Structure formats: C-alpha cells, structure tokens
Amino acid sequence: MAAKPVVVGVDGSEEALRAVEWAAQEAERRKAPLRIVTVAAMPPRMRPSNEGPEGVANELLKSSTDALDASVARAGEVAPGLITDADLLSGQPDQAIADSGSGAQLLVVGARGMSGFVALVLGSVSRYVASHAPCPVVVVRHDADAPAADGEIVVGVRESMAASEAVAFAFEEAALRGADLVAVHAWHGSGGEQHATSILTETLSEWRDKYPAVAARPEAVSGHPGHVLADYSARAALVVIGRHGAPGAGHAIGSAPHTLLGHARGPVAIVPCES
C-alpha cells in the first residue's frame, strides 16, 4: 500500500516556498510522496461580471499555476528524487486547503502569505486550516532567529493525555529525526507542580516503552500553556499541541493553540485529538 502523502498549501509567496522546503524534508523523512496544492478562487469583490473582465480571472489562474511550478521546483532542490505532484483546487481557499488534508499524514502551511488578492492560502487561512483539517497541521514560521531543524521535539501535555494523538505524533516525529523529546505541562496554583509532574510521569511511562530509542524528559512549568510552549519554540525543531473537538466543530481553535500560533518562533504542529 502506498504511503499517505504529506500535503503543503502554497500561494506563491516566499513564506509558502519555505513551507514547501519543510514539507519536502518531512516527506523524505517519512518516505512519503509530497502533494502541493493551491486554490484558484477569486475574492467576491474582484469577480468579473457577465461582461468581464475575464483578464482578472486569467491573471489569477496564471498566478496559481506559477505558484505550483515554483513550489515543485523548490521541492526538487530540497529533496531530489522525492515523488511530488501538484494540484490546482477550486472552492473557498480555507475550506479547500483544509479538505486537502483528508487521507494525508499531515498538512503544512506557512504562517503568512502574500498581500493582495492572490493571498489565498496562508495568513488567516492557516488558522482556519489548523482548526478544521482532519489531519495534523504544521504551521511553518521562518523568523530570522528561528531554531535549528535538529533541535528538540516539544509536546504540550494536558491532563489525561496518556493515549493522546498529540503525544503519539511527537514521539513519532522525534523517532524519525533521532531527536530528544520534551514533554511539557503548564501549571498554576497551589500544588500545581506536583500534580503536573504526576501527569507527565504517567504520560511518558507508556510512550517510553513504545519508543525506547527516544530520549524523553518531563518538564513542569508555571504559566499559560500557550505562552510556555511559545518560549520553548525558541529552541525546538517542532512544538506539538493537541486540538480538541471534531474538525469543523467551531472556528475557535482553543486558547493554548491560538496563543502558541501567535507567538511561536518556529514550526508548530496542531494535532486533532478525540479525547
């Protein structure tokens, strides 16, 4: 059976090309094909009337195909020999990109996109995708002082998360990279640290047996989960956090993931969790 693909959404911006680089490297690690997607959809205020102008639509179509071509070329530079295909999607950009994650191992988008009417995939759309896609979503941010790709994998641990999909994803990622894993629980209030330590011990005991080669350590930290994990992102190769609730069950992604996406200095994985 063929491996499920890694999917990346693009819009022609440099930020999108950096997301392509991240996705291509991840697909190579996972021995998976890479699928690059963009959306040919015109914002309502710019849709031509029955009389025209069709030139605007043609320009948008050309921009979309150019974005795909540039992305395929960049993926080939980063991971020569990687099986790559490109698809031009239709429909509402946010929903189309989120839906492209169906059957994928993960879906990658950039934190920001282009300005103007061709900004179809990234920026605000990335938050919609992170809260609605049926698979893990990685939002790639490349700041000037972004952490090295060979850093630790950090995962935020909530209470009763021993079987969490987010923890499973983090351990798998650490194993693929040969990286250390840091399990973090943010706490506050009297007795919070002791309770946090208990949660982390319970969580790691199960996953250490499944991934004995992964060096994992617990860290209980006082503070808001989103801000605590954002601080860790300064040195992490990837920060992983769970998204609770069914895909499409509302536009709110949750306080901690929302805060983390707004303040992280490196890539963030948002993993849908059933529990």
Language-model features: where?
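Short glycine/serine/threonine/alanine-rich loop segments
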Residues: K31-P33, L82, C135, A179-D180, ...
